């Protein structure tokens, strides 16, 4: 029963929050610091459909741009004990197909893209709380603990493995690394949990941006919080909010003030 509940929980998380890992913008992801048994493997898959208005640099003369994006995502997590703490390492990979449309110099245009997105890896360790336990010990601990606080830290690395062509403005990959150190705290009280996570994004340069340009971005600093209510193991609901600052881009040494 424990394994079944954990698998259901894992799949729910992937379906709800697997996709945002692949975005450059801030994601809102609840339960990223949840206590898991060590020595376990988790796998899940999900699908997301996205519609959005997008904006481009005015110099490109692209207006009223929209995108429709289909994403199929798979995720794997392995948990283990690390320096007497509970830890995990995970991998996310997605395949995407989408259509972008808008006005280029006042003329309607559209383009389609399909392929793999950037791979994302995450290593996380709980510094306080959430002891490294297996099987029955883990189940017994979770059954008796009603109030607890967990503090964790993590590093997310987005790899430049996605579909990318330097002669195209729209790509599924980013052609650069992104490093995201994280620090989070969770307070559980009965069926309620309150989470707070601070994170910053460090971008390497894209020296092969569209039309031979060089793209740079300042670090992006983010803060997010979530309130989670657990109805039963494997079924929960969450509400969250986030704030981000920074990430301004520079093209060929010229600040874009975005």
Labelled PLM ranges:
Residues 38, 50, 81-84, 96, ...:
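Outer-membrane beta-barrel channels and translocator barrels
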Residues 42, 69-75, 120-122, 180-182, ...:
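Membrane-embedded beta-strand positions in outer-membrane beta-barrel channels/transporters
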Residues 43-49, 89-97, 151-159, 196-202, ...:
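Transmembrane beta-barrel strands of outer-membrane/channel proteins
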Residues 50-71, 108-109, 166-173:
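Surface-exposed strand-loop-strand hairpins of Gram-negative outer-membrane beta-barrel proteins
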Residues 97-216, 258:
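Outer-membrane pore/translocation modules
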Residues 208-258:
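Outer membrane beta-barrel transmembrane domains
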């Amino acid at each position: 029963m424990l394994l079944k509940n954990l698998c259901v929980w894992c799949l729910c998380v992937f379906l709800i929050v697997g996709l945002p890992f692949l975005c450059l913008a801030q994601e809102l992801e609840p339960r990223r610091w949840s206590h898991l048994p060590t020595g376990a493997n988790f796998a899940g898959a999900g699908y997301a459909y996205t519609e959005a208005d997008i904006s481009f640099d005015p110099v490109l003369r692209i207006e009223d741009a929209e995108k429709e994006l289909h994403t199929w995502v798979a995720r794997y997590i392995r948990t283990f004990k690390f320096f007497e703490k509970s830890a995990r390492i995970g991998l996310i990979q997605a395949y995407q197909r989408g259509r972008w449309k808008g006005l280029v110099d006042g003329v309607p245009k559209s383009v389609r893209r399909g392929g793999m997105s950037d791979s994302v890896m995450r290593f996380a360790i709980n510094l306080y709380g959430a002891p490294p336990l297996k099987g029955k010990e883990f189940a017994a601990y979770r059954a008796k603990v009603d109030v607890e606080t967990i503090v964790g830290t993590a590093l997310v690395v987005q790899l430049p493995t996605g579909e990318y062509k330097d002669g195209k403005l729209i790509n599924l990959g980013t052609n650069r690394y992104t490093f995201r150190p994280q620090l989070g705290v969770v307070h559980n009280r009965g069926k309620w949990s309150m989470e707070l996570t601070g994170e910053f994004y460090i971008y390497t340069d894209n020296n092969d941006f569209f039309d031979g340009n060089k793209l740079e971005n300042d670090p992006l600093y983010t803060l997010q919080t979530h309130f989670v209510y657990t109805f039963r193991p494997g079924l929960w609901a969450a509400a969250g909010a986030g704030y981000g600052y920074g990430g301004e881009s520079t093209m060929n040494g010229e600040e874009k003030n975005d």
